[in-house]
Structures are given as structure tokens and as C-alpha cells.
């Protein structure tokens, strides 16, 4: 079970949004690279990064900050937000990124995801962001008619490295993970699932360490880490003991 600390980038700064609303951004660190190094020093083994501006623009906007993060940490980094073409994917992987996360393009052009998986095996993840059980796109600004499991099943056997599943209604508000929908997704597909949105406390961490959660590859934590609701050393100890 991997605990992924999150760095969400807006205007070059490390922020957290409430319910995916760009107008409700809380700045946690003006130096994302320093934050990445701090997470590494705390013992985390991966880093989850999202270019929030890029998710709305459809192309990389916080590229300078991402490059600084890649230079600051030795940990593998996965990046989402504005990655829409094979050229975007190749560009970031060539710069040292371990894994790209494809969200909007997975809905708009599933064939591109499958092509990317063939071209870059093990380095392509799909981000499924849901609101009211339906997949949202374009930086969560638009709702589609697709159901979460319906979309996920399109990529069975394609070589997708992981599905990052975010419940938008719980993101950034410390409401707790949507356990039911997350586990339902993990049970419906063979692709590893990473839970995102709502992780709020050490109680959530202890639940992640239970046998029923072994279907998950990991979980992403943002605000709970920044606000001190989750102690990094204790959380990592609990999850490693359950491995």
C-alpha cells in the first residue's frame, strides 16, 4: 500500500482546492520543489503532482515548477493535468517523470490511451474523476455521461499501469474516502486502483491497512498531510506493517 503525498500546482505554487474549485485555493507552499524534497525527507517513496492550470488549459502550464520538482527529489513522480497528446507524454517521460496520468483524453480519445500504453509500457495511468457517480473532464469543469466502472473497463488489457480514482465531492474537504465506490471499482477491474479525495485522518490510514483494502495499490493524501491531521512517520509505519 503506497501513500502518495500530493502537490497540486496553481500559478507555480503548491495549493489545495476545495471540491475542485480553482477559486477556493489554499496556498501551502510557494516553493513546490522544496515541498517535494520535504516529502522525500519524511520517508515517502512516491510523489503525485497535478498541474491544475494545465488541466483547464489542455496543455502544460506549470512546467517550470514540475521540472524543479523532478530535480529536487529522487522519488518517482506521477503527473496529471493537461497531458493530452503522445508528444506531451513523450516530453514529460523524457524529462524524468516516472508516470503520466491521462484524464480528459481518456474520455475523449480512449484509443490514444491504448496507443500510449503500447509506446510507453508501465508509464501510463488513467485518472478517473467522478462527481455524482459520473466522470468529470476538463479540470472537473464538465460532467460526462460515462459511469466510472464503464470507463475503467474500456482499458482492461490495454496495459494501464493504474487508475487514480478521485471523488470530487470529497476532495479537499477532509470528508473521508468514498470507500464503497473505490472498492467497487477495484473489484470491477484488474487494473490497480489508487484512491484519491477525502483522506482525512489516521483512522483512514488504519482502514487502508486492513485486509479488505489490499485490492488497492495505494491512496493519495493532500490537505490532511499539510494540515497535520496525518503524521507521515506513523502513517508510513502503519501501512508498511500491513504490507
From Swiss-Prot:
Which controlled-vocabulary keywords does the entry list? Amino-acid biosynthesis, Cytoplasm, Histidine biosynthesis, Isomerase
Q: What is its EC number?
A: 5.3.1.16
Active-site annotation: 8, 129
Q: Which InterPro entries match?
A: Aldolase_TIM, His_biosynth, HisA_bact_arch, Isoase_HisA-like, Isoase_HisA-like_bact, RibuloseP-bd_barrel
| Pathways per UniProt | Amino-acid biosynthesis; L-histidine biosynthesis; L-histidine from 5-phospho-alpha-D-ribose 1-diphosphate: step 4/9
Q: What is its main location?
A: cytoplasm
Q: Where in the cell is it found?
A: Cytoplasm
What reaction gets catalysed by this protein?
A: 1-(5-phospho-beta-D-ribosyl)-5-[(5-phospho-beta-D-ribosylamino)methylideneamino]imidazole-4-carboxamide = 5-[(5-phospho-1-deoxy-D-ribulos-1-ylimino)methylamino]-1-(5-phospho-beta-D-ribosyl)imidazole-4-carboxamide
Instruction: Give the molecular function GO annotations.
Output: 1-(5-phosphoribosyl)-5-[(5-phosphoribosylamino)methylideneamino]imidazole-4-carboxamide isomerase activity
One GO term under biological process is: L-histidine biosynthetic process
A GO CC term?
cytoplasm
The family database entries (HAMAP family) matched by this protein are listed as: HisA
Q: Which NCBIfam families match?
A: 1-(5-phosphoribosyl)-5-[(5-phosphoribosylamino)methylideneamino]imidazole-4-carboxamide isomerase
Stated family: Belongs to the HisA/HisF family.
User: What's the protein called, per UniProt?
Assistant: 1-(5-phosphoribosyl)-5-[(5-phosphoribosylamino)methylideneamino] imidazole-4-carboxamide isomerase
Q: Which gene encodes it?
A: hisA
